Design a protein with these regions (language model features):
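Active-site environment of non-heme Fe oxygenases that use a 2-His-1-carboxylate facial triad
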Residues: 1-241
């Protein structure tokens, strides 16, 4: 749990492989967060998907639910089956990318911190349109990194002054390229019994495409608020200093 909190990523090995069994692991931390996807949500290839995750297509590195005012702090993807060719996972520490820009490309960094972006989702299964404005990089009062809000698939039309449009586009393009740069990204393959655990507002995740005729891939996903992880860590430190 400390690894997850301080680095933004961990992979639990040798978890149970039965459906819904990740509850046994996660409930040792705290309760999960419910969303309209339900809990757990099934990451499988389906005929009429309401989200690109439910296809065999590749996904660019992204965070989940950026159109929420308060996106889930942590996500857990429990691998039940992964026998298909392809569909390898990727992860990138967006805080490290932001820090690179802060130190080397300050103008782009400032644009990403100070420009509200609109993220939008239209879900036919819920008969709902959700949207929220937030900057790609947000900082704490002390200037540390608080959140990354980025998903090119759900980024709506830019809503900024025409004079700033070109510079904002260029900043987003640069940020998007770095969020797929090999020097920041790791690639791996999830195996059955793995729980890929990560900070949804720091670590962006993606995957390669797969051939649905070559086998199956089934993940179950869970969310948890950041407060639950931090609260449990604070408690454990208090009783076990």
């Amino acid at each position: 749990m400390e690894l997850l909190h301080y680095t933004g990523i961990s992979i639990v090995k040798n978890a149970p492989v039965e459906k819904n069994s990740a509850f046994k692991v996660l409930n040792r931390i705290s309760h999960t967060r419910e969303t309209f996807f339900k809990t757990p949500f099934e990451v499988i290839n389906i005929p009429k998907p309401n989200n690109s995750a439910y296809t065999a297509h590749a996904l660019r590195n992204h965070m989940d639910l950026p159109w929420f005012e308060n996106p889930p702090g942590y996500q857990f993807l429990h691998c039940l089956i992964n026998s298909a060719k392809g569909w390898n996972s990727s992860a990138i520490d967006a805080f490290a990318v932001a820090d690179y820009l802060r130190k080397n490309e300050e103008k782009i960094f400032d644009i990403l911190v100070n420009t509200p972006l609109k993220f939008r989702d239209k879900d036919y299964t819920q008969e709902a349109v959700r949207s929220f404005y937030g900057s790609a990089i947000s900082l704490t009062k002390d200037g540390d990194y608080n959140d990354i809000r980025y998903s090119i698939a759900t980024l709506d039309a830019l809503d900024c002054h025409p004079d700033k449009m070109d510079s904002v586009y260029k900043a987003l393009h640069r940020f998007g390229n770095l969020l797929h740069d090999a020097k920041f990204q790791i690639n791996f393959r999830l195996e059955p019994c793995d729980i890929f655990s990560f900070n949804n507002r720091r670590l962006l995740h993606g995957r390669t495409e797969f051939d649905p005729n070559s086998g199956h891939r089934h993940l179950q996903g869970y969310y948890m608020d950041r407060d639950e992880i931090i609260g449990r860590l604070n408690y454990l430190k208090k009783i076990k200093p």
